[in-house]
A protein has these predicted regions:
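Flexible, glycine/threonine- and acidic-rich loop/arm segments that mediate assembly and lattice contacts
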Residues: 1-120, 127-146, 151-153, 169
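Beta-sheet entry/capping signal
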Residues: 120-122, 174
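C-terminal structured domain segments
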Residues: 157-183
Length: 183
């Protein structure tokens, strides 16, 4: 948010207009990312109060995948042309024991064979899933050697053998396996 207080603070700088332009360009880019990950429809008039993640501005990347390629969405079922999203349970008694297994299965089963070995594939994931995976490593007393090993594992941020990437405004409990230049 570009407040009056911030404008007043910046007014004394030679690059005042550049700072304003940069703030506007950054906000526009973040809004495009927010729409890309959260957009589900295009409303005639957007309502920011009801759709704080800009869900009604336009269809985003994830929604287009749900609609145009439902067979590439894990947990979804299509019957008579209607696709229903389903939950994928991870953990004891769930569909998968851990997130690594989810990613490996998704790469093997949901991604076309010609793209499965692409070295540029990454897992774009929500903050909560990344935290669920790595929090148990840091939430305990450890010897120095174990702490160093945990730090190394966390710094690599991998899921199912792919680089894990956090993106702003990505849904908290979702995964997207793609190339970053595909977005």
């Amino acid at each position: 948010v570009l407040t009056y207080a911030k404008l007043d603070l910046w007014a004394k700088f030679q690059d005042f207009q550049v700072r304003i332009r940069n703030a506007i360009v950054k906000r526009q880019a973040l809004d495009r990312i927010m729409i890309g990950f959260n957009g589900v429809k295009r409303a005639k008039t957007s309502n920011r109060a009801e759709n704080p993640l800009l869900q009604d501005v336009n269809k985003g990347w994830l929604q287009k995948i749900r609609e145009d390629a439902p067979d590439h969405v894990m947990g979804s079922t299509t019957k008579d042309g209607a696709t229903t999203a389903g939950a994928v349970k991870v953990g004891k008694g769930g569909d998968y024991a851990n997130l690594d297994a989810v990613v490996m299965d998704a790469v093997n089963e949901l991604i076309d064979v010609v793209y499965q070995d692409d070295d540029d594939l990454v897992v774009v994931c929500g903050r909560e899933l990344l935290s669920d995976k790595y929090f148990p490593l840091v939430n305990k007393e450890q010897d120095n050697s174990e702490k160093i090993a945990a730090d190394l594992i966390i710094s690599q941020k991998r899921m199912g053998g792919l680089q894990a990437v956090r993106a702003p405004f990505f849904p908290a409990k979702a995964l997207l396996i793609t190339r970053l230049d595909n977005l």
